[in-house]
Amino acid sequence: MPKSKRDKKVSLTKTAKKGLELKQNLIEELRKCVDTYKYLFIFSVANMRNSKLKDIRNAWKHSRMFFGKNKVMMVALGRSPSDEYKDNLHQVSKKLRGEVGLLFTNRTKEEVDEWFTKYTEMDYARAGNKATFTVNLDPGPLEQFPHSMEPQLRQLGLPTALKKGVVTLLSDYEVCKEGDVLTPEQARVLKLFGYEMAEFKVSIKYMWDAQSGRFQQMGDDLPESAPESEGESEEEDDS
């Protein structure tokens, strides 16, 4: 009798070992960066998008960025004065809560601040985001959509029909009001009609100077109770 695929045993020891190796490698990489670069900046991310963070990594190939795995980063840097890797790094660890990351660089404080202050990218809002403006659709043909899309639009709540093979909005339709917490359906409609409401923004919050060990605040303070970010995006790129 052939064995059922359900009976296949998976070695948890191998999985655990691999996970431990990845964490150890990340710790070593972080400490290597502490030894290599002049400055360490903590940044926060609003409306996280992996693709847009990758664009920043490409623009900052001369530096190193780490995002996600906050607990592992805290182990690498040290949580207290007694176990910190270098002077005052425990102050960095205290701020690793929520959607934050680390930037190691030789660029000056002024250069970093100027670049990230100017950088912003718009994207489509997701369910749970707040609408930043009201969107109303006027009745009439929606020629940007193929006829095969009509049932999907109707399912999303739009009053549509096919008229002579053209998708047509039969009456005025309010997609959302400013301040609404968007539903999945609203977010989908906004994307289909090309309305971008989410601003992807990276804000520099703190700086640590490797030479002096000085830790200083640069932007608004981060909330102490923010949830920890544990599985988001790529930890680092090669420099």
From Swiss-Prot:
Record's keyword annotation contains Cytoplasm: yes
GO cellular component: cytoplasm; nucleolus; preribosome, large subunit precursor
Compartments (UniProt record): Nucleus, Nucleolus; Cytoplasm
Biased composition (Acidic residues): 221-239
Annotated InterPro entries: Mrt4, Ribosomal_uL10, Ribosomal_uL10-like_insert, Ribosomal_uL10-like_insert_sf, Ribosomal_uL10-like_sf, Ribosome_Assembly_uL10
Reported function: Component of the ribosome assembly machinery. Nuclear paralog of the ribosomal protein P0, it binds pre-60S subunits at an early stage of assembly in the nucleolus, and is replaced by P0 in cytoplasmic pre-60S subunits and mature 80S ribosomes.
Family stated for the protein in its record: Belongs to the universal ribosomal protein uL10 family.
Entry protein name: mRNA turnover protein 4 homolog
Species lineage: Eukaryota, Metazoa, Chordata, Craniata, Vertebrata
